[in-house]
Regions:
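Short amphipathic alpha-helices within nucleic acid-binding modules
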Residues: 24, 85-90
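Vicinal oxygen chelate
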Residues: 1-4, 10, 88-128
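Core segments of cupin and vicinal oxygen chelate
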Residues: 5-6, 12-59
């Protein structure tokens, strides 16, 4: 029997410009990010970062760290939103690069964007 619960608990992106990316994920994608500094000597995730943790239901932590080398590129992450039309307008106003606007999916509506480092961010509104 494994000690691993096989459940995602953290997503971390290393970004080229932490201030710019923090503003995009906060203002454009609606995440309540908090800036802090881990000075624990960890070469992978030490240093300045902006993060949010969801604690209702299953715990999940999302963080942006200033890249110490090449930033994370080509990853994809998705967030649930209450109103996709409003979220879409907010994402574009904050500088997200549009991949596709809101489209109907079997589970609701979704739209996709690229962040400043080329990662894909999907915003999804559940079907009523």
């Amino acid at each position: 029997m494994s000690d691993v619960s096989n459940r995602l608990v953290a997503v971390v992106f290393e970004v080229a410009d932490l201030d710019r990316s923090e503003a995009l994920y906060r203002d454009g994608f609606g995440l309540a990010l908090h800036r802090s500094l881990h000075d624990n000597g960890d070469r992978w995730i030490g240093g300045a970062h902006a993060a949010v943790s969801w604690t209702q239901g299953a715990f999940l932590h999302f963080a942006l760290y200033a890249a110490k080398g090449t930033p994370t590129v080509g990853a994809q992450v998705g967030f649930a939103v209450a109103n996709l039309e409003t979220a879409h307008d907010r994402a574009l106003a904050a500088g997200a690069q549009l991949i596709h606007g809101p489209i109907s999916q079997p589970w609701g509506q979704s739209a996709r964007y690229r962040d400043f480092d080329g990662n894909v961010v999907e915003l999804t509104q559940s079907a009523p």
